Amino acid sequence: MIARNEYKKLFVEVSPAFYKNMLFNAINKKEKIMVAYQEDPSRPFRDSDFLKGEKEFEYINMTGSPWKMCRELAALVKNTHYGELIVGGYDRIYSWVAVMLSPKKKNAVIIESTLRETQKKGWRVLLKKIFFRRVNKAYVCGKSHEDLVRFFGFKGKVVDILSVGFIRRVPQPVYEERDKVTNFVYVGRLIPVKNLEWLIERFVSHPELKLTIIGTGELEEKLKAMAPENVHFTGAIPNTALPQYYQKADVFVLPSYSESYGLVVEEALNNGTPVLLSHMIGCQDNLVVNNDVGLVFKLNDVADFERQMSRICNANFYNHLRKNVSKMDFEKFEENIVRAFIG
């Protein structure tokens, strides 16, 4: 019998996000957990986007100055009985405070970054190696994430948790053959790291194809000014309406310079849509390549993009991908994520 202040797992996380909260709800149904959130100024607790969704687990919201939150976290770690301490990442001071105060044998870290996007030289590398000496277990989201912890000399246990959280899952669409591939869709923020200027330039050369861009951001007006007639902007779309856009599209495209995971790729696949991704997307290996549900092109390589675009626009090959997507079981996928955590 677990006492009120005893938990199987104590999670240390940044401001709550819906996809993490849904995962924590599922884990808490199997074993008692506590989540300590530290407020991120860029994602304050009052931001409704990150507060949506009920929390069915015990949690604490830490606010104020970083020093105040560090002191509060230190007291929590010291006075709470837990079987495992799991910190979300290694680049925040709160993760360091937690793993330094907790016994190494209880310490674990969730890795959402990949080796591709990580600095490999300099004093920060030494700091990260010190951090990983205080950790006994690393939860990763695929091979590219495991490569990162091994690069920093981690010798402990590695557990593949498959994903960073739970998407707003819908029933997987049944397979329906399509006779042509012309409609592409992008969903996300309109910011430099998403590489949308480069993507729009590609569609200038393909007036026979259509690209729908869903989202808002600092580059919105600039992108609209450079976009040809076959590129359409919708602005912000409610989450409840996104499935119809995914399912109407033939291909979801994500050309980002960097995506530590890419949860939006899961959303597209859950809506039956094959994907076309740059090689900098973290989920490409486990989720896309291994399941044969999309194609990957080398970042900013126009020739390679054109090759992969030509392949995915071939109706026979496209329908092969689409049939594979229809076989994906995201309910089972979520069960496996939870199972990875509870071991």
Regions found by a protein language model. Name each.
Residues 107-123, 134-137:
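A short, histidine- and acid-enriched strand-loop-helix "catalytic/donor-clamping" loop
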Residues 133-173, 178-179, 234:
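Donor nucleotide-sugar binding/catalytic pocket of nucleotide-sugar-dependent glycosyltransferases
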Residues 176-194, 200-206, 211:
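Conserved donor-binding/catalytic core segment of Leloir-type glycosyltransferases
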Residues 221-237:
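Nucleotide-activated donor-binding/catalytic signature segment of Leloir-type glycosyltransferases, i.e.
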Residues 236-237, 244-249:
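Short alpha-helical donor nucleotide-sugar binding micro-motif in glycosyltransferases
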Residues 257:
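Aromatic "clamp/platform" in nucleotide-sugar-dependent glycosyltransferases that forms part
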Residues 274-278:
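Short hydrophobic beta-strand element within catalytic cores of glycosyltransferases
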Residues 316-343:
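A charged, aromatic-enriched C-terminal amphipathic alpha-helix characteristic of glycosyltransferases
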